[in-house]
Regions:
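Beta-rich accessory regions
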Residues: 5-28, 43-49, 108-170
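Active-site core of glycosidic bond-cleaving carbohydrate-active enzymes
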Residues: 1-101, 113, 136
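Acidic-and-aromatic substrate-binding clefts and catalytic sites of carbohydrate-active enzymes
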Residues: 75, 106-108
Length: 170
């Protein structure tokens, strides 16, 4: 994977490319919706757009229960539901950047949210509560005894030692 320095110009270029790609009209392709939602989540300031993209999927007539999804009339696939689940998880918890980002997306629809025992890369189990768009608390358990950098949008970054509960009220 190439690791380019992210600049405002690069973000703008990526956003313009993504907007062009999604401008071709509605689609019933769930994987395109999942990919668009995840890509929008990676661009600063596009929280609402990412949530809007993700919500397009829930009304698809070809999205069934569990992992049933049909790209066409007779072709069941399972990638799209898993992609949509990943996009939803990215809204709550991201750990693919080398940090653990808790509630990286802030959208009005998730004004009050919580999750318990979600897995993060590096052998971490994370639980957290968001109330009125403010992070109330985060609990991290390191299954391997590792340390991590916790990033919470409305807190200053916190270095976390194994088995520590981080709480900030205010």
């Amino acid at each position: 994977m190439m690791d380019h320095e992210i600049t405002p110009e690069l973000d703008a270029f990526i956003a313009a490319s993504l907007d062009h790609w999604t401008s071709f009209g509605p689609t019933d392709n769930g994987f395109s919706i999942a990919a668009s939602a995840i890509m929008n989540q990676m661009i600063p300031g596009r929280d609402a757009r990412a949530w809007s993209e993700l919500n397009k999927a829930w009304g698809l007539p070809n999205l069934g229960k569990a992992t049933f999804y049909w790209e066409s009339d007779h072709c069941p696939v399972n990638e799209s539901p898993f992609g949509l689940a990943a996009a939803l998880q990215y809204t709550l918890l991201r750990s693919d950047t080398g940090n653990i980002d808790v509630f990286p997306q802030r959208v009005e629809a998730l004004r009050n949210a919580s999750f318990a025992l979600m897995r993060a890369e590096g052998g971490f189990v994370v639980s957290a509560v968001l109330k009125e768009l403010r992070t109330q608390w985060v609990e991290i358990e390191s299954l391997l005894g590792n340390e991590c950098l916790l990033r919470v949008r409305d807190w200053t970054d916190v270095a976390v030692a194994p088995s520590v509960v981080v709480e900030k009220r205010g």
